[in-house]
């Protein structure tokens, strides 16, 4: 292994004797933590140089400094520009003409970028000969000429064009002819593409493994071409309303390699077509039938031959007891079932299903409002290896049932109990699930600090906690979580009225915290947010809406320390022009919601918007639209910023119990 020379000028720095290969291995371990990599590069000149050589992936916020950045990182292979709202042709020309980048670039992400044209895409496709992965999703202005430009990338293997609504069969035909090596093509919501374009892709791109044509106006005509793809593994037909039973029957004549099939929201498919799936796809592992036909005994009988099926999604379907029982008697390899918002799920059918599928790892019962403790008893007795259980708004499940979850499902990593009757005793048992990483307890009005203290004492791996509108939680409970869960990344304490700055000061010890939602906490002030800003340097999302005591003094430390902040909601706070303008120094800031700020003036808002150069999305009160100069708005929109104007009337916040009663009434009406 090559070693660096040690010069007298370096005073025999021991780090210089370490080979590049060993240092590269160290950097590989640091890669998930960008701040650690940055700290590493600042240790010494040698490490700075090595980090530059090691980096393969770059995700800049702006394109202005790309020329100098490219000279520092000569070995880049993946460039993610999704955070750059404005990527003009001049930027793409710089990339494609770079002597170091053009031969090494293999992947570029333009999925949230705008302002490039066919000229820039053509330059990229022609000069970056090793380009294999391009994402231009959301390029709603791109037309066939842009697709034709991309078609010049002869080695392209993955192309994502979701929501490119102006592209037609002509553009996709160019892609099909030019990019013969494609293995993945995403055309979801490309409304101008029909049977002709999809058929051409299927005929010309024989190596396709993944094809997503969801919500395209295609019919059965293109199915015969699709079924002839010899290596197709993942086919997404969500929302293709013109594909019916005949089209599904045609699919069974080929696609022997198919592993994933999504026919959710395909309204023209009836129970008659489902047996085609069972007889044609022996290797199928993932099937999505959500928002489609009723799950009856006859339908499930058609799936009996899917012996390798592992994931089945039936979200939003009407299910019957006989259908659930039939599902229990087939598909023995199932490890994941989703019944979210399925009408008709009862104890009898669900209990039989889970008893027969004890190997389940993921179960989604969101809004299955008819199940009781009977179902929970069967789930916890049979599916002891569950890693994820979602049961939001299962309102007939009594508090005693949650004891069973904690007592029997020790391997849980994700648990969603939003809007349930769980109490402190239930949380005490849930704390036995020591591997839990995601815990959602929103609108759980029976829990208090006592239950949370059990979670804090026993669940050190917790990274996400949702306590939205759980009114019994106070500073003591949050402090317990902060002490016991040092790796916490996300917490939601919105509308927990008794939360004060003490909670935020405690949470400031969680150095990995990146998302804090404390809207509607009237006792929280700028002191607490200042503590968060000073310690939680990875903070990216902050919601302090309706925190009336939050003023400009909180914005100063945020501007100074929270340089990774990307999204902030300041609505209904006491922040003024001064505080808003101070946020201009946060170069990462992209999304801002500022409704009903009494101290905000039109001139102050204009200055702040102009100074915050990275903004891509701003929500504003409609009244400001006529106050801001039109040339200013045009300039900001040209910079890549989108404005969302709201005519929202100030609303008085309801008591948590009144709010839940109102929510239950709405659910009953639905």
Task: List each language-model region with its residue ranges.
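N-terminal adaptor-interaction module of cullin-RING ubiquitin ligase components
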Residues: 1-180, 184-189, 194-215, 219-227, ...
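Conserved "Asn-ladder"/turn position within leucine-rich repeats
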Residues: 84, 113-114, 139-140, 164-165, ...
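Structured C-terminal portions of repeat-based eukaryotic scaffold domains
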Residues: 509, 530, 538-541, 545-612
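Leucine-rich repeat domain C-terminal region
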Residues: 589-600, 610-670
